[in-house]
Swiss-Prot record:
Family matches, as InterPro entries: Med31_sf, Mediator_Med31
Similarity comment text for this entry: Belongs to the Mediator complex subunit 31 family.
Protein's name according to its UniProt entry: Mediator of RNA polymerase II transcription subunit 31-B
Molecular function via GO: transcription coregulator activity
One protein family per Pfam: Med31
Length: 129
């Protein structure tokens, strides 16, 4: 009985890891283009699987994600129009470029905010002495 429970736990762990890896792959527009060109998005069972994977948006699961933009892509994949557009390599390229721009600006903005916060803390420390 304990062996069966351990085996079930192991199967759940493996399934969790596989689904985590797959969901994170959805952050890659070139992979989405690959799936679209091979007709995966026309398969109703695959589209249903994408709907099932929306549970990753729950904070209980989302905390394990390294690439949070995969959740946005997963949400967009719920729309047939978006899935159809992904067949076009130019669409995937555009998404890829937009992601790069987002991260470039996000990094700069974050650095500026951190510098401003550090300066403010430094001023607070000197004024309280």
């Amino acid at each position: 009985m304990a062996a069966a429970a351990m085996e079930a736990d192991e199967q759940h762990r493996i399934r969790f890891q596989l689904e985590l890896e797959f969901v994170q792959c959805l952050a890659n527009p070139n992979y989405l283009n690959f799936l679209a060109q091979r007709g995966y998005f026309k398969d109703k069972s695959f589209v249903n699987y994408l709907k099932y994977l929306l549970y990753w948006k729950d904070p209980e699961y989302a905390k394990y994600l390294k690439y949070p933009q995969c959740l946005h892509m997963l949400e967009l994949l719920q729309y047939e129009h978006f899935r159809k557009e992904l067949v076009n390599a130019q669409c995937a390229k555009f998404i890829d470029e937009q992601q790069i721009l987002h991260w470039q600006h996000y990094s700069r903005k974050r650095m500026r905010m951190q510098q401003a916060l550090a300066e403010q803390q430094q001023q607070n420390n000197t004024s309280s002495k």
